[in-house]
Amino acid sequence: DDITNALEADIALRGIGRKFQTPRVYDSLTTFENMELALPGSRQVRKFFRRSVRRDECDNILQILERVRLKDDRHTEAKHLSHGQRQWLAISMLILSSPKLLLVDEPAAGLTDLETELTAELLLELKDEHTIIVIEHDMDFVRQLDSKVTVLNEGRILAEGDMGELTANEEVIEAYLGR
């Protein structure tokens, strides 16, 4: 199905979670409050402020925050998190609703080397539970994911394979290195 013009809620209902290059988190809310807002069924802001979190929801949030290394920052406002931590918060907000497919745009953009490595580890952990499509220009990061890679050029598929195959592919070299 084409989701190009679909509403965000309809996309989520189809089991698709999207993380954009710039993390969509609420700066003035704590890490935990951002997660509360992402709970399925709490999309309306008024509902969020009036509802109490059930024990099982709280446990699930804490489990996910521990998994993404943010449990100790659960009371920290998002504006005080590093860029990498904000990326992890955005990813954790997505996985809270257990989507079948995660579309992750530029997860390594602007991260430190350590944050990049930890983000790759997180995505590798998640790939057993979700189908993940990563859009990324950092080839070292892509190499860490050790997955099938599809190279696009001018809107069309240029090549597919593992990183070893693609770095030796003449079409890829021509398109991206201009030889």
Residue ranges, per PLM feature:
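Helical segment within the ABC ATPase nucleotide-binding domain
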Residues: 116-128
